Amino acid sequence: MTQSSKPLEVSRIFPARFDSLADISVFVTQKAEVAGLGPRAVYAVQVAVDEACSNIIEHAYGSEGLAGVRPQPDARAHPAARAPTIECTCRIKRDRLIIQLHDHGRPFDLATVPNPDLEADLSERHAGGLGVYFIRQLMDAVQFESVPGQGNTLTLIKCRTPPDLGVNSGPEAA
């Protein structure tokens, strides 16, 4: 794969609906492959983005009922933005893929979600929370920012590693 020193950046706006998840997956999969990620890392990106977008639809937009959605300031400028949307931006740098998911729903900071107690008996575990745990485990970095009037941005970063290493390839995986 030949890459210039300039990062490649591509954005696409999707309706914030569960039936958009397949299209979002195709979009990020193509960018992950162009970024040179190995098959396991591509799969990790697919799972993390699917879970993150599901969380945006469910929590930021109140499922597809869209309860409590903030008006989008650019709705007149962009007809596609009138309905709740998820803007997916993929930025390919020399050694990583950066995915930003931007929405105008209620803020939902993944940092406020504690890791689940995986050792606890199933009857003692809280419902939910595993998706956020998977996102954290599958990606190399996860950041969240909410700016009033501008929306929420979830940034997911996956670094390129040799294809023979596992999804979470660090010194312990070698």
Residue ranges and their predicted role:
Residues F18-L21, V42, Q46, A83, ...:
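Short, structured helix-loop boundary elements
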Residues S5-P39:
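Helix-loop-beta hinge of the Bergerat
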Residues A48-E58:
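Short, well-structured hydrophobic secondary-structure segments
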Residues V26-D50, S123-H126:
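Conserved short strand/loop->alpha-helix "switch" segment adjacent to the catalytic nucleotide/phosphoryl-transfer site
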Residues M1-S11, I56-A174:
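Conserved beta-strand-loop-beta-strand hairpin that lines the nucleotide-binding pocket
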